[in-house]
From Swiss-Prot:
This is ATP-dependent RNA helicase DDX51. InterPro entries: DEAD/DEAH_box_helicase_dom (IPR011545), Helicase_ATP-bd (IPR014001), Helicase_C-like (IPR001650), P-loop_NTPase (IPR027417), RNA-helicase_DEAD-box_CS (IPR000629). Residues 97-108 have a biased composition (Acidic residues). The gene is DDX51. It comes from Homo sapiens (Human). Residues 9-152 are annotated as: Disordered.
């Protein structure tokens, strides 16, 4: 760093009075005082900023190298430094040389001794024009930190901590932001034994339907039915051709435990809304994931439409396409005549009829009911819903201005969109494990939806994870949960002990694959003493229907199944559900154990867990809000009497598997 003093000519009088020697001595004294003041300030700032570095520098000074700036070699003329003949540029200084002693006077117009080399006649960087006689303090202050005085005060450089020093801290949990209809549902009571509502308390139900209910032994509604039936009847209060007040009714979503009466909650209002129809058209369409469940729902519709002119058609692929076409449409001289008011179908078969059945029309569709909605959403890759919606809003003659009830796609509610009334399409979603993920529900295109949910499901909204499945499922009140720690080899022995020693008459056992189900069936059959059957896709629809009927009648004691029967199948009298293979997902467990403790009855669920599965499974159920699981340990002494017959059955199982492989190869 070089401090300089610009000697300006003060005038002839002042120069004559002071003389050349006095002026030069005064300039040197002022420059020295300014330099000392800047050096002291630099030391104070350095000590305030890095007190620890100065101590570390003193201790590590011999081991560290001092950084020095690269020096430039400059050509020095023979003229003395400080004389008017000296060249422009910086002067080299010896190490440890005092800057104040070497600061010298420069001529006006020459660059300062601490600045970079510039063209002759240009002002030095960082300085500004000043009045004659004033010192360029701003330029000196800017140049001060770069000089040797600051280097001496700073001392040697000490390496510091660049990365690290971060403490472990748990990330805050982000609360999901849900739409209002999901965050504030219509809460439904979940106790189906104490919160019953008498039939007379809902007078809007048609007297003929009330008579049908009493004839089948129903004198009270379950809480879900008491909440959903009035809401659906209100949306069809002005008839099924137009919505209430001419507006499109809201879509409904119902999330309630298994066995809480969801099927009857939509059967009663749909049948009542269509009682006034004159011409037969497809007004209600029920879409379900499995053939067995579709057959069960079709049976309920047939019961309550028996004394009415309404007709129900089942379309699941159990019959040939031609047979199903005969139950849907009839060809006449004037065209095609519809033969069904209510159609119960599976997605794949429904799309087949939309594409291949002449005269099959959904243009008069009023109710679209999606049961087991969470599984139906997972099968949206089949694109069945867009096909149904496109068929429902397809117009025969879009250019006809006289079509008063011409169906159009739903738009924003404006004066123009409501001036011409049209028959609305109302969507109804039902499931025990209805997802609350807005991204998935958006695929359904719901219109101003309303959610009916149990209190437990509403509580779980705050604990919804990325899939939208955690902490929001409700279990039947009368269900008792158990888990049995065991090894992989002792699993069949545990199942045999539960069936033979504990005296359960109807046991439903679930496995994760069709192969595991078949092998366990062969093993129990070889063991003997148990009426066992297998329920899987190995059998056709007729055989599966016969097996379920025998199981309900008590002719089959143990039914080994895959998850095919875990979805909505209402099997009467199931006392015990055994999870032979622990379910991987929460909603799979909910549907499995929901086959027992239905309609207010009691039931038990046992899950066989390996040691590596216990922690994850228990945490999953705890987050779901399930009641406390009871640990049920079986000692080797209890299973020892079954071991001899079990070993014989294993040898027979091996032979049976070999024979089946030979048959497949042949």
């Amino acid at each position: 760093m070089a401090l300089f003093y610009v000697a300006r000519y003060p005038g002839p009088d002042a120069a004559a009075a002071a003389g050349p020697e006095g002026a030069e001595a005064g300039a040197h004294g002022r420059a020295r005082a300014l330099l000392e003041r800047l050096q002291s300030r630099a030391r104070e700032r350095q000590q305030q900023r890095e007190p620890a570095q100065t101590e570390a520098a003193a201790s590590t000074e011999p081991a560290t190298r001092r950084r020095r700036r690269p020096r430039r070699r400059r050509r020095v003329n023979d003229a003395e430094p400080g004389s008017p003949e000296a060249p422009q540029g910086k002067r080299r200084k010896a190490d440890g040389e005092d800057a104040g002693a070497e600061s010298n006077e420069e001529a006006p117009g020459e660059p300062s001794a601490g600045s970079s080399e510039e063209a002759p006649g240009e002002p030095s960087a960082g300085s500004s024009e000043e009045a004659p006689g004033e010192r360029s303090t701003s330029a000196s202050a800017e140049a001060a930190p770069d000089g040797p005085a600051l280097e001496e005060a700073a001392g040697p450089l000490v390496p510091g901590l660049v990365l690290g020093g971060f403490g472990k801290r748990k990330a805050p949990k982000v609360q999901p932001f849900l739409p209002r209809w999901l965050a504030e549902p219509n809460c439904v009571r979940r106790n189906v034994t104490e919160d019953l509502v008498p039939i007379e308390d809902i007078p809007d139900v048609h007297p003929d339907l009330q008579k049908q209910l009493r004839a089948h032994g129903i004198s009270s509604y379950f809480p879900v039915q008491a909440a959903v039936i009035p809401a659906l009847l209100e949306s069809a209060a002005c008839g099924f051709l137009v919505g209430r007040g001419g507006y499109r009714p809201s879509d409904l979503c119902v999330s309630a435990p298994t066995g809480s009466g969801k099927t009857l909650a939509f059967v009663i209002p749909v049948v009542q809304a269509l009682l006034s129809r004159v011409v037969c058209h497809i007004r209600a369409l029920v879409v379900l994931p499995t053939k067995e469940l579709a057959q069960q729902v079709s049976k309920v519709f047939n019961i309550y439409t028996d004394a009415t002119p309404l007709r129900v058609s089942l379309v699941t692929g159990q019959k040939s396409l031609a047979k199903e076409q005969e139950s849907l449409v009839q060809k006449t001289a004037d065209g095609y005549r519809c033969l069904a008011d209510i159609v119960v179908a599976t997605p794949g078969r429904l799309v087949d009829h939309i594409d291949q059945t002449p005269g099959f029309s959904l243009q008069q569709l009023r109710f679209l009911i999606i049961d087991e909605a969470d599984r139906m959403i997972d099968s949206m890759h089949q694109s069945w819903l867009p096909r149904v919606v496109a068929a429902a809003f397809q117009s025969e003659d879009p250019a006809d201005p006289c079509a008063l009830l011409q169906r159009r796609q739903a738009q924003a509610v404006t004066a123009a969109s409501t001036c011409c009334p049209q028959m609305p399409l109302q969507k109804l979603l039902f499931s025990a494990t209805l997802t609350q993920n807005p991204e998935k529900l958006q695929q359904l295109g719901l219109h101003q939806p309303r959610l009916f949910s149990t209190g437990l499901a509403h509580r779980g909204l705050e604990d919804t994870d990325g899939d939208g499945d955690s902490g929001k499922y409700a279990f039947p009140v009368g269900l008792t949960h158990h888990y049995v720690p065991c090894s992989l080899s002792s699993k069949p022995l545990v199942v045999l002990h539960l069936v033979l020693e504990m005296g359960f008459s109807r046991v439903l056992c679930f496995t994760n694959s069709r192969e595991n189900s078949h092998r366990l069936f062969l093993l129990v059959q070889a063991f003997g003493g148990v009426d066992v059957a297998e329920f899987s896709s190995r059998y056709g629809p007729g055989q599966r229907r016969m097996i379920l009927k025998q199981f309900e009648q008590g002719k089959i004691q143990l039914l080994i199944s895959t998850d095919a029967t875990a979805r909505g199948i209402d099997v009467q009298g199931v006392e015990l559900v055994v999870n032979y293979d622990a379910p991987q997902y929460l909603r799979t467990y909910v549907h499995r154990v929901g086959r027992t403790a239905r309609a207010g009855k009691t039931g038990q669920a046992f899950t066989l867990l390996l040691k590596v599965q216990e922690r994850r499974f228990l945490r999953m159920l705890t987050e779901a809000g399930a009641p406390e699981l009871q640990r049920h340990e079986l000692s080797s002494k209890l299973l020892q009497p079954l071991v001899p017959r079990y070993e014989e059955a294993l040898s027979q199982l091996e032979e049976s598997v070999k024979e089946e492989r030979k048959q497949r190869a042949a």
